[in-house]
């Protein structure tokens, strides 16, 4: 009996050991055993055993939940994470001593989205050796998702912008602009910016006063040519037709729209021929020039440089909307006698800077019609020369009017319309024109207007003497001795824009011509003949005149005068202020001063 019991116990123990060995088979890479695992129900169906047998049978109970967690973990890993390329291909090669890695075939196929970023070093090992890190890693990727989503939304929003607007945002260009003193500034502009907009930008950057007289000048030093850009011209387009040595200048030009202010004073009757009867009025003259249906003609004699030669020939030329013609037979304007000299459509008219020296011109009142392209030959230039400055101004103005027409008048009207649309509080509190200034007598209890010109002149002289007395009292109070006045009055004028220092007469005339031959344009400079004196250079009726300002002494004080001591001023600032309000001995009042701005 005992032998039978012992044999049955040994057979039971061997069966349990075989069951335990089967449950502890090593796991493969996918977490499955090498042989089929018996179910839990079949295990529980065995008869009751001893406590030792229960302890041995309890071991597989903990293996199944762990295996189930690994299977769930594997499903979570393959479903929640995106397809990420393996950053450690050497680990997947089965090198000895290296931990196992996930096979690429076990991952889902890559989606159509852009590939995700690689894991940082060490991440592949952490996900295999420490499965509990999966939740934190997945959460970390879920936190990064809004950032990627935001970038995607931004890219989609940018892609919805029209192509024309995208090109406008991308097309920017740097333009270098020079001032009269040689300084320069590089400005980044849009490709569709006009000359007026660029001038306003430069006025803002250089802290100047925007009086709508600033212009952009196209300057060609090698050709000796320059012209003012029209306000509507595109700067980048003009720059594309300029050679590399050419440049833009930032300058004043008070005469740009002088024709619209005084059109009757521009063209003599013998220069203009109308296709219809004109009464000669100012409004009719403007309408005939600006109306595209009208056909005005500007004719007269000009010196024309012969092509391929240094000689000039006097020809009778005629300017029409279709171009510039010259007559082969005297002053005849018959079609068979007219030959085309230059086209207006694809050309621009320039001033000759030094035509007499560079092109052997008869005088310094030259013009040039240049094609609008970067590379040109000398034979393509049409060099012209007028008799005087007034005739040259008429031809230059006629060329602009016939080429641009109403567009030129709109450029003139835009600043005035902006002033009318400006809010009342932005306008100056006091705006007085020169025509509204009258002489007043305040000697009595009630002020009265002085109508007699002789009495008005005497009142102006008395005002000048009153200024002299006030300045004398100020000098006495500010100086220790009346015999040694303060040196401030002798140098304070150097801080003003209208004072140009030690320049020659020719240089002062050149500056006046560049900034427009309008009445009242002036500048002050040091005298070359008298070291203690100054010179007032003034433009009147398109002619430049010079007036010497001499120092004089009175009661031990030094004064400055223009009229041999009749009107004296303690400094040049007072002198300029006085003649801006009073004509005195000058042909006209001082209206505009020549200025040079450093960019």
From Swiss-Prot:
<dbReference type="InterPro" id="IPR029071">
    <property type="entry name" value="Ubiquitin-like_domsf"/>
</dbReference>
<dbReference type="InterPro" id="IPR036860">
    <property type="entry name" value="SH2_dom_sf"/>
</dbReference>
<keyword id="KW-0727">SH2 domain</keyword>
<dbReference type="InterPro" id="IPR015042">
    <property type="entry name" value="BPS-dom"/>
</dbReference>
<feature type="compositionally biased region" description="Low complexity">
    <location>
        <begin position="32"/>
        <end position="43"/>
    </location>
</feature>
<feature type="compositionally biased region" description="Polar residues">
    <location>
        <begin position="44"/>
        <end position="61"/>
    </location>
</feature>
<comment type="subunit">
    <text>Interacts with ligand-activated tyrosine kinase receptors, including FGFR1, INSR, IGF1R, MET and PDGFRB in a phosphotyrosine-dependent manner through the SH2 domain. Poorly binds to the EGFR. Directly interacts with MAP3K14/NIK and is recruited to the EGFR-ERBB2 complex. Interacts with GIGYF1/PERQ1 and GIGYF2/TNRC15. When unphosphorylated, interacts with AKT1 and when phosphorylated with YWHAE/14-3-3 epsilon. Interacts with NEDD4. Interacts with LRP6, thus interfering with the binding of AXIN1 to LRP6.</text>
</comment>
<dbReference type="InterPro" id="IPR039665">
    <property type="entry name" value="PH_APBB1IP"/>
</dbReference>
<feature type="modified residue" description="Phosphoserine; by MTOR, MAPK1 and MAPK3">
    <location>
        <position position="481"/>
    </location>
</feature>
<dbReference type="GO" id="GO:0030674">
    <property type="term" value="F:protein-macromolecule adaptor activity"/>
</dbReference>
<feature type="compositionally biased region" description="Pro residues">
    <location>
        <begin position="97"/>
        <end position="118"/>
    </location>
</feature>
<dbReference type="Pfam" id="PF08947">
    <property type="entry name" value="BPS"/>
</dbReference>
<dbReference type="GO" id="GO:0042327">
    <property type="term" value="P:positive regulation of phosphorylation"/>
</dbReference>
<keyword id="KW-0597">Phosphoprotein</keyword>
<feature type="modified residue" description="Phosphoserine; by MTOR and PKB/AKT1">
    <location>
        <position position="433"/>
    </location>
</feature>
<feature type="compositionally biased region" description="Polar residues">
    <location>
        <begin position="1"/>
        <end position="23"/>
    </location>
</feature>
<feature type="modified residue" description="Phosphoserine">
    <location>
        <position position="436"/>
    </location>
</feature>
<dbReference type="InterPro" id="IPR000159">
    <property type="entry name" value="RA_dom"/>
</dbReference>
<dbReference type="GO" id="GO:0008286">
    <property type="term" value="P:insulin receptor signaling pathway"/>
</dbReference>
<feature type="modified residue" description="Phosphoserine">
    <location>
        <position position="50"/>
    </location>
</feature>
<feature type="modified residue" description="Phosphoserine; by MTOR, MAPK1 and MAPK3">
    <location>
        <position position="98"/>
    </location>
</feature>
<dbReference type="GO" id="GO:0005158">
    <property type="term" value="F:insulin receptor binding"/>
</dbReference>
<dbReference type="InterPro" id="IPR001849">
    <property type="entry name" value="PH_domain"/>
</dbReference>
<dbReference type="GO" id="GO:0046325">
    <property type="term" value="P:negative regulation of D-glucose import"/>
</dbReference>
<dbReference type="GO" id="GO:0032991">
    <property type="term" value="C:protein-containing complex"/>
</dbReference>
<dbReference type="GO" id="GO:0032868">
    <property type="term" value="P:response to insulin"/>
</dbReference>
<feature type="domain" description="PH">
    <location>
        <begin position="295"/>
        <end position="404"/>
    </location>
</feature>
<dbReference type="GO" id="GO:0048009">
    <property type="term" value="P:insulin-like growth factor receptor signaling pathway"/>
</dbReference>
<dbReference type="InterPro" id="IPR039664">
    <property type="entry name" value="GRB/APBB1IP"/>
</dbReference>
<dbReference type="GO" id="GO:0120162">
    <property type="term" value="P:positive regulation of cold-induced thermogenesis"/>
</dbReference>
<feature type="domain" description="SH2">
    <location>
        <begin position="498"/>
        <end position="594"/>
    </location>
</feature>
<dbReference type="GO" id="GO:0030159">
    <property type="term" value="F:signaling receptor complex adaptor activity"/>
</dbReference>
<dbReference type="Pfam" id="PF21989">
    <property type="entry name" value="RA_2"/>
</dbReference>
<dbReference type="Pfam" id="PF00017">
    <property type="entry name" value="SH2"/>
</dbReference>
<dbReference type="GO" id="GO:0045719">
    <property type="term" value="P:negative regulation of glycogen biosynthetic process"/>
</dbReference>
<dbReference type="GO" id="GO:1904738">
    <property type="term" value="P:vascular associated smooth muscle cell migration"/>
</dbReference>
<dbReference type="Pfam" id="PF00169">
    <property type="entry name" value="PH"/>
</dbReference>
<comment type="similarity">
    <text>Belongs to the GRB7/10/14 family.</text>
</comment>
<dbReference type="InterPro" id="IPR035037">
    <property type="entry name" value="Grb10_SH2"/>
</dbReference>
<dbReference type="GO" id="GO:0070371">
    <property type="term" value="P:ERK1 and ERK2 cascade"/>
</dbReference>
<dbReference type="GO" id="GO:0010467">
    <property type="term" value="P:gene expression"/>
</dbReference>
<dbReference type="InterPro" id="IPR011993">
    <property type="entry name" value="PH-like_dom_sf"/>
</dbReference>
